[in-house]
Amino acid sequence: MTAIKHALQRDIFTPNDERLLSIVNVCKAGKKKKNCFLCATVTTERPVQVKVVKVKKSDKGDFYKRQIAWALRDLAVVDAKDAIKENPEFDLHFEKIYKWVASSTAEKNAFISCIWKLNQRYLRKKIDFVNVSSQLLEESVPSGENQSVTGGDEEVVDEYQELNAREEQDIEIMMEGCEYAISNAEAFAEKLSRELQVLDGANIQSIMASEKQVNILMKLLDEALKEVDQIELKLSSYEEMLQSVKEQMDQISESNHLIHLSNTNNVKLLSEIEFLVNHMDLAKGHIKALQEGDLASSRGIEACTNAADALLQCMNVALRPGHDLLLAVKQQQQRFSDLRELFARRLASHLNNVFVQQGHDQSSTLAQHSVELTLPNHHPFHRDLLRYAKLMEWLKSTDYGKYEGLTKNYMDYLSRLYEREIKDFFEVAKIKMTGTTKESKKFATLPRKESAVKQETESLHGSSGKLTGSTSSLNKLSVQSSGNRRSQSSSLLDMGNMSASDLDVADRTKFDKIFEQVLSELEPLCLAEQDFISKFFKLQQHQSMPGTMAEAEDLDGGTLSRQHNCGTPLPVSSEKDMIRQMMIKIFRCIEPELNNLIALGDKIDSFNSLYMLVKMSHHVWTAQNVDPASFLSTTLGNVLVTVKRNFDKCISNQIRQMEEVKISKKSKVGILPFVAEFEEFAGLAESIFKNAERRGDLDKAYTKLIRGVFVNVEKVANESQKTPRDVVMMENFHHIFATLSRLKISCLEAEKKEAKQKYTDHLQSYVIYSLGQPLEKLNHFFEGVEARVAQGIREEEVSYQLAFNKQELRKVIKEYPGKEVKKGLDNLYKKVDKHLCEEENLLQVVWHSMQDEFIRQYKHFEGLIARCYPGSGVTMEFTIQDILDYCSSIAQSH
């Protein structure tokens, strides 16, 4: 085992700087091979690392190889299996349990003892030893007396050092000189003892020989100690001197620190003073401008604006911590507050005076516009006030209460001014629409006329926008048609209270121009005022959602102050609402006046609602493109609702007039008045609504009207006593079809086809009904023939029927010679001419259809004769050519 241990040390552990302390020959439990060893090793370098190494003998030779190594610190438990009986088995618990069987119990105990010592020395008893004999562990524990014995192995472990080359050489020389030592160890030991004694004696003699030198050395040491004492005394004196200097330097350093601190404080104090002086010192010129600056001149306004900005900067300066506790700062702030209050009062008072003066100046120009349909220009007023825009912005940020008061006063003054201007403007528009003059209203010598005009004006003003549609729109249209149609219409419908001369195209064109001029004057006026309010009062006017007019109409002078009692500026959304509310207050009379004007236009002619709908829609669309939330857009939108309501009412009135129409029992019906009026309405509407934005409304109205026309044409046709129903339907639907074909109204294509179909159907029905009269007996005879055939009698056997034999056929045919047929056709032509009206010019169309139908019946009769009476030689006493000649001569003779 010693030779194996030496070989393992040399071949495996020495190259790795390790020492082999213990070895045990083992095999795994359950296996018979014993060619592996467990080795306990330590490293020669510090820190010492203790390992358990498994070494296996190579199968191909006698050399060993290192298979696996575990650090001893990873060993948790050493299980010897049995502490009493000898047992070569033991377990080592690393990351898993390794079961071993030693070659002998002695080797196992020696290995476990070595592990115990290494555990005691390097691992501080970390490893648990289970089933290990206490005697084995006690032998390994060092005690006082036997420490040198029991701890020998440990000391050997600690003091073992490998011989260097020189030591190995000396030992080899000594061994060569003492070869007999191998055979005679006692002689060799004795020789070594003698040499040791010789060396000890030499050492003693050397020590005794150096005694004198030692004494000399001691004296030198004593002298050196004395010198050291002297040096220490000098150093002590130097130290005392340095201590004094140190105290003086500390005083100087402290003094310098205080001086530096004082300088720093002075610099900071100067900086604070400069900050306060630079940011809270208002120039005397600014103070003078705020106290007594001229607010009427441009130069004075500029000086006051600069002074107000400087004051605002001084008041809004961000003070540093502690500044607000300084008395001077408090006094300066109070002075600034007094200046701000003083200038705010001066500015508010001056602007109030400007508002009043401008209102008086503007009122003086009203007389110049009283006879013209134009609104006074407020641009000079706005231009003068915009010079104060920056001051208004300053007032808004510094004293919101006075800013709010100015806003209220401006609305009060301007609302009264605009109310006078707008009412006079609308009064002129009404006069121009009605054709009267303002002077005649005021100075008319005829009391009846003056009373009538006054009553009409009062009724319009008293309506407050409440509209009443005309009940005679159909009559008004009929007046514009031809004389014959006008006379028919006047005989059917109530003409209302408006004269026919007021309803011509020129009057409608004049109304259209006046209404357009009214809107064109109002639009720039409102936009200019809204733009001025935004700029002058510094309010944002864009990106606002339009509010309801019902909420805005309740605005009074105190609304704004009630909304912001805190005196703080409005947020952006509230500013947008404020612009809208100010515009509503200033122009509160626009919507009622527009409604009154619309009511007048509707009273003059209900068809004026078409013009108003198109014009108002266009202006609303334009205003919404500029700013959907503007007052103008909202107001015109509300008025547009009224106009649309009037338009719908106009359509409803026309339908109601259709339903109420009454026809004369003594004269023929002809073209119904509402059919002719629909034609003129459609023509007028197409010219008005060309490329208009509200085309959809007209299309809906067309649909309602045409349905009403269709229904009431049938109603009148059913009630007609003088004119046959088919004639009424045929003529009127022909007229409707011609109208729709000419106007090419895309939304009424289906109705156009329906009208054509109704016209065609009733034309055919009328022709068939009328043609049954001239050849009545012949018709009855052949109807009987067809009835027999329908009952199942063969056609060639009909002639054997008593009532329908050849003699009866000849008898009936003889009753209708050519002369009688021509006479009957002539009577038929006269009757048709009596039924049809001249306007539609359908006589020839109907006559030609009758001719075709007569020829068709003739051919039908000829066919029945050929089939039912073959070989009889019976024929009609007139031919198709005779029929053509009869019809042509009759048409030419009339």
From Swiss-Prot:
Biased composition annotated in UniProt, kind: Low complexity: 460-491
Coiled-coil spans in chain: 152-174, 205-259
Keyword check for RNA-binding: no
Cellular component, GO, one term: perinuclear region of cytoplasm
Source organism of the structure: Homo sapiens
Domain of life according to the entry: Eukaryota
GO biological process terms held by the UniProt record: defense response to virus; exocytosis; Golgi to plasma membrane transport; membrane fission; mitotic cytokinesis; protein transport; regulation of macroautophagy; vesicle docking involved in exocytosis
Family: Belongs to the SEC3 family.
General function of this protein: Component of the exocyst complex involved in the docking of exocytic vesicles with fusion sites on the plasma membrane. (Microbial infection) Has an antiviral effect against flaviviruses by affecting viral RNA transcription and translation through the sequestration of elongation factor 1-alpha (EEF1A1). This results in decreased viral RNA synthesis and decreased viral protein translation.
Subunit structure: The exocyst complex is composed of EXOC1, EXOC2, EXOC3, EXOC4, EXOC5, EXOC6, EXOC7 and EXOC8. Interacts with EEF1A1. Interacts with SLC6A9; interaction increases the transporter capacity of SLC6A9 probably by promoting its insertion into the cell membrane. (Microbial infection) Interacts with West Nile virus and Dengue virus capsid protein C; this interaction results in EXOC1 degradation through the proteasome degradation pathway.
Gene3D superfamilies, alphabetized: 2.30.29.90
Phosphoserine modifications at: 470, 473, 487, 501
Molecular functions per Gene Ontology: phosphatidylinositol-4,5-bisphosphate binding
Region spans: Disordered: 439-495
Residue ranges crossing the lipid bilayer per the database entry: none
Keywords of this entry: Antiviral defense, Cell membrane, Coiled coil, Cytoplasm, Exocytosis, Host-virus interaction, Membrane, Phosphoprotein, Protein transport, Transport
Main localization (coarse): other
List of residues that carry Phosphothreonine: 471
PANTHER family given in the database record: EXOCYST COMPLEX COMPONENT 1, SEC3/SYNTAXIN-RELATED
Ranges of biased composition (kind: Basic and acidic residues): 439-459
One of the Pfam families matching this protein, by short name: Sec3_C-term
Protein name, as recorded: Exocyst complex component 1
Matching SMART domains: Sec3-PIP2_bind
Places the protein is found: Midbody, Midbody ring; Cytoplasm; Cytoplasm, Perinuclear region; Cell membrane
KW Acetylation (keyword) present: no
